[in-house]
Amino acid sequence: MSSDSMRNIRNFSIIAHVDHGKSTLADRIIQLCGGLQAREMEAQVLDSNPIERERGITIKAQSVSLPYTAKDGQTYFLNFIDTPGHVDFSYEVSRSLAACEGALLVVDAAQGVEAQSVANCYTAVEQGLEVVPVLNKIDLPTADIERAKAEIEAVIGIDAEDAVAVSAKTGLNIDLVLEAIVHRIPPPKPRDTDKLQALIIDSWFDNYLGVVSLVRVMQGEIKPGSKIQVMSTGRTHLVDKVGVFTPKRKELVALGAGEVGWINASIKDVHGAPVGDTLTLAADPAPHALPGFQEMQPRVFAGLFPVDAEDYPDLREALDKLRLNDAALRFEPESSEAMGFGFRCGFLGMLHMEIVQERLEREYNLNLISTAPTVVYEVLKTDGTIIPMDNPSKLPPLNHVEEIREPIIRANILTPPDYVGNIITLCEEKRGSQIGINYLGSQVQISYELPMAEVVLDFFDKLKSVSRGYASLDYHFLRFQVGPFVRVDTLINGDKVDALSIIVHRSYADRRGRELCEKMKELIPRQMFDVAIQAAVGSQIISRSTVKAMRKNVLAKCYGGDVSRKKKLLEKQKEGKKRMKQVGRVEIPQEAFLAVLQMDK
């Protein structure tokens, strides 16, 4: 495709922290370009998933193509790729940015710059994108435009003099944003090859069409009837339909260079179009694949088990379909003595885990139990081999273990100065070591090295509570570091429950063992016999609590009479309880597995 035909295409995405008004701004842009009639408009048009709507966050990247007639009289085609703002979904952001030439940095004029937008903005600048600052929510009485501009310059380091001040809610100045997109974001550049190269931004499964992929065509064109090849797998597929979202699905005769749209090549296998891969023509392939974004490594692992064992094949199929749409999800089969067959799943963080579980339960009608999440440790065995360890119950015997290393992350926290003391106290409690503190205008940037196990579970919630919601967090993995770790096992009536094992720092083992026993005592229902709950490190019991037995009053029917009769009945009851204890299984409720999560709170 010639550079002339690409001159009027603008591919952009919006970078913003959670709740800074990104989806609302997208709604206004769609409305102004006439993508949907006024009666079809609904809040957060692009957040199509019901969970996104309820939580008010964007999880999946979405795309929309809009024609816009600018003030210079020319018609431009704007391809907007929506991105999530939460730290767990940063891989969705890096993928969307790889398909763009520019980005709008949306900052809430009342709250100022937040950590997640800083991280995503750096990703955009590294990929060579033109970043246009937009100050949103200027209709709020607390909005301070000059302060927000100064913060963008101090914290992110890009020029904010020409920042566009808008209110997405009222629609004020949205036309200026569109003009800025047209004049400041460059058109797609022609590549050095004229052979087809298209980046897969996202894929999802449609019950009628099979796999539908969202692609950005870098060079060449895709038409229905052409035979395409997936470069990493070498598989070929025949294209059935191509088109764009306006945001409704609209079919086209071809997708040309610089355009973003969907293609359907009746791929039935969910792994047929891996996200981040390159598509090319089978007859005339491109010499090399596009530089994809880096593959995200899952950081949190948990077991997912169906409550009803017959649902196991359905769970596998549901995870397969979700994986297509969620490139960061990993899973492999696992069996547990306590829970039966299920899957060990890897997630990017706790929010990601909650959302995957919620989607499985809602969209696929599954009833699931999840085990306590754990991070990946590195275990150096005495024979010199290093094994990654994402499941505490699989830890080798301690006499075979030389050392256990835990993942350490670098956390960057942005906060108003008033809360610095509270945040430092929180980080020290979590075994953190301080790297530095920078005062940037009205914000303070605090850098810490923290163990990932401490951050993953509830650090985010605690950070919000000690800073009254003002602090924001971004983190990335640094290295593995040796530490004194032990595995705390939970025994119920002498039987080890593998799903309740946790790996903890030795100094916390006694306290965690005690808390776990107390919590389990509250949650395990009373049986006809005493239930002993014990926490153990190796063969040493560190804590115990007992759920007392329920007693039936066997003497109720004895009115008076000889005492030996009563003794006989009590002895008989005792014998029965003894026998029951030998054969009785204790049912452990789902809340008990989640108790491991809530212990720190």
UniProtKB/Swiss-Prot annotation:
It catalyses: GTP + H2O = GDP + phosphate + H(+). One of its GO terms (biological process) is positive regulation of translation. GTP binds at residues 19-24, 136-139. Gene3D superfamilies: 3.30.70.240, Elongation factor 4, C-terminal domain (3.30.70.2570), Elongation Factor G (Translational Gtpase), domain 3 (3.30.70.870), P-loop containing nucleotide triphosphate hydrolases (3.40.50.300), Translation factors (2.40.30.10). It is an enzyme of class 3 (hydrolase). GO terms for cellular component: plasma membrane. GO terms for molecular function: GTP binding; GTPase activity; guanosine tetraphosphate binding; ribosome binding; translation elongation factor activity. It comes from the Bacteria. Its EC number is 3.6.5.n1. The keyword Cell membrane applies. Pfam families: EFG_C, GTP_EFTU, GTP_EFTU_D2, LepA_C. CDD domains: EF4_II (cd03699), EF4_III (cd16260), LepA (cd01890), lepA_C (cd03709). Residues 7-189 form the tr-type G domain. InterPro entries: EF-4 (IPR006297), EFG_III/V (IPR035647), EFG_V-like (IPR000640), EFTu-like_2 (IPR004161), G_TR_CS (IPR031157), LepA_C_sf (IPR038363), LepA_CTD (IPR013842), LepA_IV (IPR035654). Keywords: Cell inner membrane, Cell membrane, GTP-binding, Hydrolase, Membrane, Nucleotide-binding, Protein biosynthesis. It is a peripheral membrane protein. It is found in: Cell inner membrane. Belongs to the TRAFAC class translation factor GTPase superfamily. Classic translation factor GTPase family. LepA subfamily. Required for accurate and efficient protein synthesis under certain stress conditions. May act as a fidelity factor of the translation reaction, by catalyzing a one-codon backward translocation of tRNAs on improperly translocated ribosomes. Back-translocation proceeds from a post-translocation (POST) complex to a pre-translocation (PRE) complex, thus giving elongation factor G a second chance to translocate the tRNAs correctly. Binds to ribosomes in a GTP-dependent manner. This is Elongation factor 4. It comes from Xanthomonas campestris pv. campestris (strain ATCC 33913 / DSM 3586 / NCPPB 528 / LMG 568 / P 25).
